[in-house]
């Protein structure tokens, strides 16, 4: 088991280029192609995705709009951030305001921010 852990640690330390090179060497050594396996598994995974309904949303502030001060006030009320942090979030848009919220709460937050003049996206 210690040997397996060492292999995992070694693989984890590879750069992306080194990992790609390793994949190519293993394909040549074993006479297989990773692309073929991905092509076969890809459509099945894509077909299963629409069946799942999204339950957690991220409310993203896309743009502050014209009433930046009002948006900052709403961001502070929603997140509990201090004035400087809320201002930085608003000025750094697009940025997530709240993550991992249910659909109802996400819609409520979106409505609050849009009422203040912001452009908001749910992801």
Swiss-Prot record:
GO CC annotations, alphabetized: cytosolic large ribosomal subunit
Pfam families: Ribosomal_L12, Ribosomal_L12_N
Example of a GO MF term: structural constituent of ribosome
SUPFAM superfamilies: ClpS-like (SSF54736), Ribosomal protein L7/12, oligomerisation (N-terminal) domain (SSF48300)
Keywords: Ribonucleoprotein, Ribosomal protein
Keyword Ribosomal protein annotated: yes
Disulfide bonds: none
A GO biological process held by the record: translation
Subunit structure: Homodimer. Part of the ribosomal stalk of the 50S ribosomal subunit. Forms a multimeric L10(L12)X complex, where L10 forms an elongated spine to which 2 to 4 L12 dimers bind in a sequential fashion. Binds GTP-bound translation factors.
Xref: PANTHER family: 39S RIBOSOMAL PROTEIN L12, LARGE RIBOSOMAL SUBUNIT PROTEIN BL12M
Family assignment from sequence similarity: Belongs to the bacterial ribosomal protein bL12 family.
Function: Forms part of the ribosomal stalk which helps the ribosome interact with GTP-bound translation factors. Is thus essential for accurate translation.
Protein name (record): Large ribosomal subunit protein bL12
The organism of origin for this protein: Rhodopseudomonas palustris (strain BisB18)
Organismal lineage: Bacteria, Pseudomonadati, Pseudomonadota, Alphaproteobacteria, Hyphomicrobiales
């Amino acid at each position: 088991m210690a040997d397996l852990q060492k292999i995992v640690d070694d693989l984890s330390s590879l750069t992306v280029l080194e990992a790609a090179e390793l994949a190519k060497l293993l394909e040549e050594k074993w006479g297989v192609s990773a692309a073929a396996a991905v092509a076969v598994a890809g459509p099945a995974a894509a077909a299963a995705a629409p069946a799942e309904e999204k339950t957690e949303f991220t409310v993203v502030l896309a743009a502050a709009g014209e009433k930046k001060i009002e948006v900052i006030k709403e961001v502070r009320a929603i997140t509990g951030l201090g004035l400087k942090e809320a201002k930085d979030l608003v000025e750094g848009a697009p940025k997530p305001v709240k993550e991992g919220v249910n659909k109802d709460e996400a819609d409520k937050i979106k409505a609050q921010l849009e009422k203040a003049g912001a452009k908001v996206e749910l992801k």
